[in-house]
């Protein structure tokens, strides 16, 4: 509760939750996916920032009886319109038929996995968490062999797909300088609950007073961009900077 904005009781076993971790000023430290493996066992599939040291610091300060560690887990994303059929051929009907934001603990050929119906794209997709780092080659070769006839190829996250889907990227689109209300993520904040968390008072104040800036989507006219921007672009109106573009 000290770290996560959404009530832990809202998270049911075998389900995922998109959550926010904020600092004392309400700034976003990370926006991980929370997976509840058991009543007292949770995973945070984090974005690109150091949450491990933050979580350990919170635990020490609060004197909580909790163990925080980085497990032997290697994530692999399987995204795209044919991902369900590939997953079905690779691991069977049960993981392939998972509902959105559900996950299952699964063993394939003696290899322990966690498979979730999540992903960082606007497409149908899954995330496969390998729980044995020594089996990475076997898992990779199996999925690629099954997926090859369906056009599966290795790649990286498509910036345009996640931008079009309004999926924010930590560091690029948000940092601790941004709060959930500015980012349009107020649906993830529960400020009127009885439980406490880091940043609660600051977020209550921000909610009451309102924000002075907002994160919005823009459409840019002209020729298509050759690639993504490497730095933030200033938005000028009447020779005055009124904002900036984070991702394009």
Predicted regions and their residues:
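Residue-level preference for beta-strand/loop junctions
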Residues: 2-4, 26, 212, 227
């Amino acid at each position: 509760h000290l770290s996560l904005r959404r009530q832990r009781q809202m998270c049911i076993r075998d389900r995922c939750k998109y959550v926010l971790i904020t600092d004392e000023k309400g700034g976003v430290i990370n926006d991980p996916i929370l997976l509840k493996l058991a009543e007292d066992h949770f995973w945070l599939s984090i974005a690109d920032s150091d949450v491990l040291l933050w979580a350990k610091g919170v635990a020490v300060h609060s004197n909580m009886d909790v163990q925080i560690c980085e497990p032997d887990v290697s994530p692999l994303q399987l995204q795209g319109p044919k991902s369900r059929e590939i997953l079905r051929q690779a691991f069977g009907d049960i993981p392939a038929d998972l509902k959105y934001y559900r996950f299952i603990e699964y063993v394939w050929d003696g290899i322990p996995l966690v498979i979730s119906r999540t992903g960082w794209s606007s497409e149908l997709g899954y995330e496969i968490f390998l729980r044995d780092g020594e089996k990475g080659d076997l898992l990779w070769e199996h999925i690629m062999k099954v997926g090859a006839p369906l056009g599966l190829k290795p790649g990286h996250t498509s910036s345009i797909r996640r931008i079009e889907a309004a999926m924010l990227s930590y560091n690029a689109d948000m940092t601790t300088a941004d709060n959930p209300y500015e980012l349009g993520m107020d649906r993830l904040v529960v400020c009127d609950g009885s439980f406490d968390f880091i940043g609660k008072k600051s977020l209550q104040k921000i909610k009451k007073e309102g924000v002075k800036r907002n994160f919005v989507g823009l459409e840019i006219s002209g020729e298509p961009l050759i690639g993504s921007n490497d730095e933030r672009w200033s938005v000028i109106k009447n020779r005055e900077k009124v904002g900036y573009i984070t991702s394009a």
